[in-house]
Design a protein with these regions (language model features):
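Outer-membrane beta-barrel channels and translocator barrels
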Residues: 29, 82, 130-134, 182-186, ...
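Short glycine/proline- and aromatic-enriched beta-strand/turn motifs that initiate or cap beta-hairpins
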Residues: 19-70, 229
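Residues on the lipid-exposed face of transmembrane beta-strands in outer-membrane beta-barrel proteins
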Residues: 36-40, 71-79, 93, 121-127, ...
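Glycine- and aromatic-enriched membrane insertion/assembly motifs of diderm outer-membrane
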Residues: 53-108
Length: 230
């Protein structure tokens, strides 16, 4: 959070130092925009239990997904068409983690960590308002492909091994909203976004206590991003 605040202050100070008047017609003269982004994330999952879980006669009692914070950085490219619309991609390298807590009848079970280092390419459609007083709002929606470099999809997982693997490639739909602030040389934007998985990402080992007790996992990701765009 401190790094984000410092970045905002540096951009503001740099703009004032050059004392160049703002280009109010920049949006209407340009069609292509590029920028950089830093994001804070909260990774969760939607989990469904397999019917075999309810038929178990062993000591396993419950399985609970847990969310964890993460982050990422990347670059954006946008194409403006019409007065209010943009087609945008925000390529990101993201690091986050999801946990699964197992509870046994007499003792706490293992807390399994699913760590992710992903390369994400979204394609979103953005609708923005006018920009009175150098500020405007926007909404967006689209789809995203995510490739996980940490995936254990190709690993042979034994039935008793405390490991839950997710597929290397997952797909999301996402919606969000944000606010843009015009400075002398760049537009700063603060964006909130929610991404929900479309495909079942679980690699299920049928006789496993761990992944075999679940039918599906759909990853979810909530993010807040700070972007600077030319």
């Amino acid at each position: 959070m401190r790094k984000i605040i410092v970045l905002i202050l540096l951009l503001v100070v740099a703009g004032k130092a050059f004392s160049q008047p703002r280009d109010y017609n920049r949006d209407y003269r340009k069609h292509f925009f590029w920028g950089i982004a830093f994001a804070g994330t909260y990774a969760k999952m939607k989990m469904e239990l397999d019917p075999v879980f309810w038929q178990r006669t062993d000591s396993i009692q419950s399985i609970r997904p847990q969310g964890q914070a993460g982050g990422g950085f990347g670059g954006s490219v946008a194409y403006r068409f019409g007065k209010y619309w943009e087609l945008k991609t925000l390529t990101m390298l993201q690091l986050h983690q999801r946990n699964i807590q197992y509870a046994w009848q007499h003792t706490p079970g293992p807390n399994i960590k699913i760590e992710t280092i992903s390369f994400d390419i979204p394609l979103t459609l953005k609708y923005r308002s006018d920009m009175p007083n150098n500020t405007r709002m926007y909404v967006l929606g689209g789809v995203r492909w995510s490739h996980d470099f940490q995936s254990n999809q190709g690993l042979v997982i034994g039935e008793s091994k405390p490991l839950v693997a997710l597929k290397a490639n997952t797909y999301y739909y996402e919606v969000g909203a944000g606010m843009e602030f015009r400075l002398d040389f760049v537009d700063l934007s603060l964006e909130l976004k929610m991404s929900n998985g479309l495909n079942n990402a679980l690699i299920r080992v049928p006789n496993s206590y761990y992944s075999g007790s679940m039918a599906s996992i759909y990853p979810r990701l909530f993010s807040i991003s700070l972007m600077a765009q030319n």
